[in-house]
Amino acid sequence: SLVGSEMCIRDRIIIANTYALGGRDFDIQTAYDYMKKGALIPGTYSQNVEVRPGLHTYITKGIENASLCLEYTSADYAIGQFALQAMGNRDDADFFMNRAKNWKNLYDPSTTWLRSRHNHDLSWKDPNHDWREATKENYFWMVPFDLPALIDTIGGKAAAKARLDSLFVRLDAGYDDHFYAAGNEPDFQVPWIYNWIDCPEETGRVISRIFHEAYHATPNGLPGNDDGGSMGAWYVFASVGLYPMIPGVAGFTVNAPQFERITMHLPEAPLTIEGGGADLWVRSLKVNGKKNKSMWVDWKDICKGGSLLYETKKLRR
């Protein structure tokens, strides 16, 4: 049956990621049918939980309360990727990935922030309203599937860097604070966004700070509630230097691993990761002996084993 979850739609991303990364041991057609049903039919329930509250408004006007709308856009993008990869359905893929662009309906050029609108006339709400357990600064970057467009929207890479830098003044935001929350899921992917603006050293710097300041080897050492194992998963991804950034897309953005050598025992052959250590950033990367052109690694290049060699440099203090 359709599975309810926190914010109701993250399971769609999990299913799409599972398929993209090679998982096939499930009923693909049934999964897709339920994914579509929850995304297209208002009032669909699962386990007494409405799958997408406010879906009628999202469908007819392209908006919903801001944090909910951003959750829906990521889910739509994941469904679109699943439609393309698993079902070979280009029409559905185009529909859902285009609908994922609803995040643009939240952008207010007068403030350069995302914010909610009133349903009746589309006028702007208070910029600090409708953010679930966080603030507009935390949620702003929750468009992982369309980062180039988001960056261009606010004026380009320099403007994006200034906004990112201002977010990372602290790492321990509570629900009402306007800086980074290492202990809250909407912020998990933000350190790697520096890779999209050609600042991998800053990616390394922020992740190093999070390791030192937010995670501790104590019984209460996580920075927040480990919802569904999310904090632990973040720590593992960051430690091996591979982060699954884009919903439904088989690939990883990179940071310096925390270990000099890592061996992953994949089904066909091992994947070795070398060049890591504490407090480093990535200057360049070789994938299976060939220099990589970006801070992104396609899963297809390493899924059958191989090697990743990180060329790293010590962070400047």
PLM regions: where:
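Short, small-residue-biased leader/transition segments that mark boundaries at the very start
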Residues: 2-9
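Active-site core of glycosidic bond-cleaving carbohydrate-active enzymes
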Residues: 9-12, 19-270, 295, 300-309
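C-terminal beta-sandwich/jelly-roll accessory domains of carbohydrate-active enzymes
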Residues: 276-317
